[in-house]
From Swiss-Prot:
It is found in: Plastid, Chloroplast thylakoid membrane. Disulfide bonds join C71-C172. Disulfide bonds; Cys-289 and Cys-292 are probably involved in the formation of disulfide bridges with 'Cys-11' and 'Cys-105' of PGR5 while Cys-261 and Cys-264 are probably involved in the binding of a Fe-containing cofactor (FCC). The C-terminal loop (247-313) is required for ferredoxin binding. The gene is PGRL1B. Induction: Up-regulated by drought stress. This is PGR5-like protein 1B, chloroplastic. Belongs to the PGR5 family. Inhibited by antimycin A. GO terms for molecular function: oxidoreductase activity, acting on iron-sulfur proteins as donors. It comes from Arabidopsis thaliana (Mouse-ear cress). The keyword Electron transport applies.
Length: 313
C-alpha cells in the first residue's frame, strides 16, 4: 500500500508530496504544527550523521598487506630514516658486541629492506664504516667498544679511503682552541685531470688508424663477436692506458682535496702533487678562502683544514 504525505514547513504548508512505501507504516494526516517541526528535525539530522560516518571512514587509516611493518601510512606513527638507521646500528652492535638479539631475523630483514628502499647509505656501508658508526654510538651511550687510539686509527684509515661518513663540518676544539674542518677527495676534478690526456690518446689512435690505411677501422667493423672483443678488450684498454700514462708523466702523485672554510663554509680546493719537474714535498698548502679571504692551512696527512696561528675565525 502507498500513502501520500504532505509535510508542512513551520506555519506554511508544503505541497511537495512524500511517498511512504511501507505497507505496515501508518501515515496519519493531518499533522499538527508541533509534530511537523519534530519530523523536520529528524529528517535534517539524518544526512548529517551519514556524512559524519562517511568522513570518518575516509579519514581512517588504510590497511595494505603489502606495506612493511616499518612503513605506516599514519604520519604520526611513521618513523624517520634517521630513527630506522639508529635502530639498525643498535641491532648490529647488540648482536656482534653484546651477543644479544634485540629483534628477530625477520624484523631485521624488514628493517634493512625498508632502509634500502628509502635510499639509506647505512646498509651499503663497508665493515669499517659500520664499525666506526657503532663505535661512535657506543661512545655516546657511555659504553665505548674501542680505545681512543683504535678509534683515531680507524677514522684516519677511512679518511684515506675517501669515506664521507668521517667528514664533518667546521667545528671548534676546546683543547687546542682551534677551528678546523675535514678534507675530502674531489674525485670529479681528479677525473677532469685525465681529460686532456684522453683527448691526446684518441688523437694518436686515429692518427695510427690513418697511417695504417684504416686497418683499425676494418677491425672495428668485423662481424660480431670479433668487433666487440677487439673494441672492449683491445682498443679501449689501450686508449685508457695511454691516457693514464700521459697524465702520470705530467702529474706525479697528485691529489685534489676539498673542504668547507671554517669561517664562512665556502668550499675550497687545493692541489697536492708534482707538476713536471716542480716538486711539492710538503703535506700542507696555504689556501685563501674565495668567499671571505681567510687564510687556511690544508693538511693532506691529517686531512684537516686549520687556521694558522693568530688567524681569526
Amino acid at each position: 500500500m502507498a500513502f501520500t504525505l504532505t509535510i508542512p514547513r513551520f506555519s506554511a504548508i508544503s505541497r511537495k508530496p512524500i511517498t511512504c512505501s511501507s505497507s505496515r507504516t501508518q501515515c496519519p494526516a493531518p499533522f499538527t504544527h508541533g509534530r511537523s517541526i519534530s519530523l523536520r528535525r529528524r529528517l535534517t539530522l539524518l544526512p548529517l550523521k551519514a556524512s559524519t560516518d562517511q568522513s570518518g571512514q575516509v579519514g581512517g587509516e588504510e590497511v595494505d598487506s603489502k606495506i612493511l611493518p616499518y612503513c605506516s601510512i599514519n604520519k604520526n606513527e611513521k618513523r624517520t630514516i634517521g630513527e630506522m638507521e639508529q635502530e639498525f646500528l643498535q641491532a648490529m652492535q647488540s648482536f656482534y658486541y653484546e651477543g644479544k638479539a634485540i629483534m628477530s631475523n625477520e624484523e631485521f630483514d624488514n628493517l634493512k629492506e625498508e632502509l634500502m628502499w628509502e635510499g639509506s647509505s647505512v646498509v651499503m656501508l663497508s665493515s669499517d664504516e659500520q664499525r666506526f658508526l657503532e663505535a661512535s654510538m657506543a661512545y655516546v651511550s657511555g659504553n665505548p667498544i674501542l680505545s681512543d687510539e683504535e678509534y683515531d686509527k680507524l677514522k684516519m684509515k677511512l679518511k684515506m679511503d675517501g669515506s664521507e661518513i668521517v667528514c664533518e663540518g667546521p667545528r671548534c676544539s676546546l683543547r687546542s682552541k682551534k677551528v678546523y674542518s675535514d678534507l675530502a677527495i674531489d674525485y670529479f676534478k681528479m677525473f677532469l685531470l685525465n681529460v686532456p690526456a684522453t683527448v691526446v690518446a684518441l688523437g694518436l689512435f686515429f692518427f695510427l688508424d690513418d697511417i695504417t690505411g684504416f686497418e683499425i677501422t676494418y677491425l672495428l667493423e668485423l662481424p660480431e663477436p670479433f668487433s666487440f672483443i677487439f673494441t672492449w678488450f683491445a682498443a679501449v684498454p689501450a686508449i685508457v692506458y695511454l691516457a693514464l700514462s700521459l697524465t702520470k708523466l705530467i702529474l706525479k702523485d697528485f691529489l685534489i682535496l676539498k673542504g668547507p672554510c671554517p669561517n664562512c663554509g665556502t668550499e675550497n680546493v687545493s692541489f697536492f702533487g708534482t707538476i713536471l719537474s716542480i716538486p711539492n714535498d710538503s703535506n700542507t698548502n696555504n689556501v685563501k678562502c674565495s668567499g671571505c679571504g681567510t687564510e687556511m692551512v690544508y693538511d693532506s696527512g691529517s686531512r684537516l683544514i686549520t687556521l694558522p696561528e693568530g688567524g681569526k675565525a
